[in-house]
Amino acid sequence: IPAAMHAPAAQTRGSRTRSIRLPLGHVVATPGALVVVRDHGLDIVGLLHRHRSGDWGTVSDHDARANDLALQNGARVLSAYDLPSSGGRAPGGRLWIITEADRSATTVLLPSEY
């Protein structure tokens, strides 16, 4: 994972200390997310690993708690990863990763594509 994609510990929310293996199901990405991944040179597999392992990125405390509960009750799981601007080449922003409640699919997308 590029160093820029490591969220500072104070901003990262989730169950990083537990050994979580969230089933991802079929993994897909929206066209907009793929453009951002390319423009920022992101390691999408690394981000999916973080999501799968319970590192929810920069979600709110409320959303982090909801994700932790979703692991127990089978609800949807949302991670958010802030993107740095890449030297004027691409603006910063945010990338979401959502795993469906039934764990059949995980989607990488931009918040505007939700």
Mark where each language-model region is.
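Short, compact, well-ordered microdomains
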Residues: V77-Y114
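Short, Lys/Arg-enriched N-terminal segments with co-localized hydrophobic residues
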Residues: I1-A4
